[in-house]
Amino acid sequence: MGLSRLKIGRLSSGGIITNYFCTSACRHCLYNCGPHWEKRYISVEDAEKNFRAVKALGCSAVHIGGGEPLQRPEELGAVLDAARRFGVSIDYVETNSSWFKDPESAEAVLSGLRPKGLHTLLVSISPFHNEHIPFAR
């Protein structure tokens, strides 16, 4: 059976990659994300296509990852808005916390995204991440 005949009948979970640019270059990164990528971000149109497809396959929630989605909080907000328009909830946004500078600025970023559907962060912490990002972040 060739790949052209492969059909996904139902999707039970999934993820949307917003970007490949990342402040780290973790040796274990499946997608080879890092600072060598352009700082491009998924367009709202592409996000909408993905959410439409996810919903059509019976999936009502996904996670968001990258790269580092929170390097561009305004664009992340637009993606969260698109998910809401298609009735797709966000399980979590994965982050390496490199964007974190202090509690006050983090609260400002996160409080702006919460009404858009960001309720949970999955913070990546490992020896690979700690090579590039201080554990304290």
Give short role names for the model-derived ranges:
Residues 1-95, 100, 104:
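Conserved alpha-helical substructure of the radical SAM core
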